[in-house]
Design a protein with these regions (language model features):
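Non-catalytic cell-wall polysaccharide-engagement segments
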Residues: 5-6, 34-111
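Short, functionally critical alpha-helical segments immediately adjacent to catalytic or ligand/cofactor-binding
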Residues: 8-25
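Acidic/histidine-rich, surface-exposed loop or edge segments in extracytoplasmic proteins
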Residues: 27-32
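Short acidic-hydrophobic catalytic motif
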Residues: 1
C-alpha cells in the first residue's frame, strides 16, 4: 500500500530519520535545514510531511527512476548531487545505508 514502503510505515521512517540525523545530539532536528522550525515537534511534522509527500511523488513518477521508495526519498531528503560541497556529498552517501540500519534496528526491537 501507499502507506508502507518496503514494509515500513511513515512513522517508522520518521523515527529512523531522527536517529540517522543524530537524534538528540543533532544540530538540526531530523536534518531539517531548508526551513525554520520552532521546536523538535515542528521539525518532526516537517519530516513526516516530507516522507508522506515523497511517497506520493514516488508512486506518481519516482518509481520510473528509482528501484524503491527509500532510494527515492534519499535522493530528495539527503541528495548526493547538486550544489553540495565535497564533504556534504561524502557524508550524504551514507544516509540511505544508515536509514535502513535504523529501520531494521527498530523492527527488531518491536518484535
Amino acid at each position: 500500500s501507499l502507506a508502507r514502503a518496503e514494509g515500513f510505515t511513515d512513522s517508522q521512517i520518521v523515527r529512523a530519520i531522527w536517529y540517522t540525523e543524530g537524534g538528540q545530539k543533532a544540530h538540526y532536528a531530523y536534518g531539517i535545514r531548508s526551513v525554520r522550525y520552532r521546536d523538535i515537534a515542528e521539525a518532526r511534522r516537517i519530516c513526516y510531511n516530507t516522507v508522506r509527500n515523497n511517497r506520493r511523488r514516488y508512486a506518481q513518477y519516482g518509481h520510473k527512476q528509482y528501484p524503491d521508495y527509500l532510494s527515492f526519498l534519499a535522493s530528495r531528503y539527503c541528495p548526493t548531487t547538486g550544489k553540495l560541497s565535497r564533504a556534504e556529498k561524502k557524508l550524504n552517501r551514507n544516509w540511505l545505508k544508515n536509514l535502513k540500519y535504523f529501520l531494521m534496528k527498530g523492527e527488531i526491537k518491536c518484535k
